[in-house]
Swiss-Prot record:
The keyword Kinase applies. ATP binds at G13, L14, S15, G16, A17, G18, K19, T20. This is Adenylyl-sulfate kinase. It catalyses: adenosine 5'-phosphosulfate + ATP = 3'-phosphoadenylyl sulfate + ADP + H(+). GO terms for biological process: hydrogen sulfide biosynthetic process; sulfate assimilation via adenylyl sulfate reduction; sulfate assimilation, phosphoadenylyl sulfate reduction by phosphoadenylyl-sulfate reductase (thioredoxin). It comes from the Bacteria. The active site is at S87. Its EC number is 2.7.1.25.
Length: 185
């Protein structure tokens, strides 16, 4: 039996803030310790599960709703689910929390200029040139979490430091390293 309880760790932040990078490192460390982990990443999911959706507010909300449903199924089966989605709107993140239940909101915080510097795809430049509509942080708002469960400052921390904070939080809240008697009951 695994020493873990299902939970969704929801990484939110601007494009380029480091959501996927930190989630991959958390996934690597947890799997190395034998935990069952599944990572849902915005870029990958949009190629498969939500390819019919665009980037209007309504489509973004629907994207989050669908992914919340998948995360809920995984979480209910005691999988540690790492979700990396910009998820720019507070209300949609609150809806995700309500759908999923066991939910940890992680604000991956980096200043816009840092995110732009990290942008290898040139998306920010295209958005600033008017070539991409509804681009979060440029032509569409990002509503930062008001009370995230955890905040990572990826402009001031290494990837390993950020990942360690997430893993320590999971331990503190009793999602990993559970004693056998808790799991049996």
């Amino acid at each position: 039996m695994r020493n873990q309880k299902g939970v969704t760790v929801w990484f939110t932040g601007l494009s380029g803030a480091g959501k996927t990078t930190v989630a991959r490192e958390v996934e690597r460390q947890l799997k190395e310790k034998g935990y069952y982990v599944q990572r849902l990443d915005g870029d990958i999911v949009r190629q498969h599960l939500t390819r019919d959706l665009g980037f209007t507010k309504e489509d973004r909300d629907e994207n989050i709703r669908r992914n919340s449903f998948v995360a809920k199924l995984l979480t209910q089966n005691d999988i540690i689910t790492l979700c990396s989605f910009i998820s720019p709107y507070r209300k949609a993140r609150q809806t995700a929390r309500e759908i999923i239940g066991e939910f940890i909101e992680v604000y991956v915080n980096a200043p816009l200029e840092v995110c732009e510097d990290r942008d290898v795809k040139g998306l920010y430049a295209k958005a600033r040139a008017g070539e991409i509509d509804n681009f979060t942080g440029i032509s569409d708002p990002y509503e930062p979490p008001q009370n995230p469960d955890l905040e990572l400052r990826t402009d001031k921390e290494t990837v390993e430091e950020s990942a360690s904070k997430v893993i320590e939080y999971l331990e503190e809240k009793g999602y990993i390293n559970l004693p056998e008697d808790v799991l049996a009951g």
